[in-house]
């Protein structure tokens, strides 16, 4: 009970900014990424499927919408592999077991990962109408989500899958109160258990993701796929200034383990993705984190407890 109350307080504090693009501003990630299922995994997508969860606070009782930016695969943003031949399907789920089903919180599209009740779906191929534009799912009634006591809110899920072709789809989401504009829901948040995304084509830009460290976490295993030796992944927290983790090569996974410090419990890590020089362009990567029990850890787009800042003393090395 104490754990649930603590998480709830942190959720309230963290979502006061109300900004709900996915990826969020603090993450500085250009696009989510999903390839068609005929693509080579060396393009950076390990399983051609990505799930995100939206948390609607219990106080909110009005219709809402899930908007998708550039939902088609074709045009300026998406990644071409020969000719555009890719079809992607977006599916929105609510109802019982949409989040509480264990398979829904796993990192691979296996078992009952499409748990819950299908509320809406739409397939997109190359379509200039939606290139650099928005498609809106909804309206949805908050009561259609799964109520989760720990969050004091209702959960919805959206899955994007590449069901045909071999091109890369770059896209974003926005949780909105308006079908035609991006208007945030106060107190809402979004999270995922695996992040598949496009890195910036600019080595001055640093991307971030923020896994939350729950009570009882002793150690974490950080896994990344197809990093392509594109610089460094650095972990920042309230108790550590920066710890580099192992990075993967092309079409490979790399794992690294990190012992959790007492001060880090109930806060978020800041995983910083620092690009290499010379510039590696169009790099797509996949990241997930598990605790010592093998359970997946959530990445909140609005970090729980806020963006972590190192609280210790900064060491200065004098210049001779």
Identify the function of each model-found stretch:
Residues 2-10:
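Sec-dependent signal peptide recognition
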């Amino acid at each position: 009970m104490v754990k649930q109350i603590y998480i709830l307080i942190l959720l309230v504090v963290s979502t006061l900014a109300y900004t709900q693009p996915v990826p969020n501003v603090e993450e500085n990630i250009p696009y989510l990424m999903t390839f068609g299922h005929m693509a080579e995994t060396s393009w950076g997508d390990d399983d051609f499927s990505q799930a995100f969860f939206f948390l609607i606070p219990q106080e909110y009782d009005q219709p809402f919408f899930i908007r998708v930016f550039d939902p088609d695969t074709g045009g300026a943003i998406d990644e071409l592999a020969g000719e555009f031949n890719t079809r992607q399907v977006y599916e929105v789920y609510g109802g019982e077991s949409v989040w509480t089903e264990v398979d829904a919180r796993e990192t691979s599209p296996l078992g009952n990962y499409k748990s819950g009740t299908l509320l809406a779906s739409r397939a997109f191929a190359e379509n200039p109408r939606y290139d650099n534009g928005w498609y809106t799912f909804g309206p949805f009634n908050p009561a259609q989500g799964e109520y989760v006591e720990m969050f004091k809110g209702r959960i919805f899920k959206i899955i994007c899958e590449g069901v045909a072709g071999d091109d890369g789809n770059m896209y974003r989401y926005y949780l909105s109160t308006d079908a035609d504009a991006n208007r945030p829901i106060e107190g809402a948040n979004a999270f995922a258990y695996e992040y598949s995304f496009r890195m910036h084509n600019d080595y001055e830009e640093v991307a971030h993701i923020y896994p939350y460290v729950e009570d009882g976490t002793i150690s974490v295993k950080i896994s990344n796929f197809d990093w392509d030796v594109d610089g460094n992944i650095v972990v920042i927290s309230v108790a550590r200034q920066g710890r580099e983790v192992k990075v993967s090569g092309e079409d490979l996974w790399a794992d690294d383990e990190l012992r959790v410090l007492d001060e880090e419990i109930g806060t978020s890590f800041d995983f910083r993705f620092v690009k290499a020089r010379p510039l590696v362009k169009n790099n797509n990567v996949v990241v997930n984190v598990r605790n010592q029990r093998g359970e997946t850890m959530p990445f909140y787009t609005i970090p729980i407890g806020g963006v972590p800042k190192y609280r210790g003393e900064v060491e200065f090395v004098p210049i001779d």
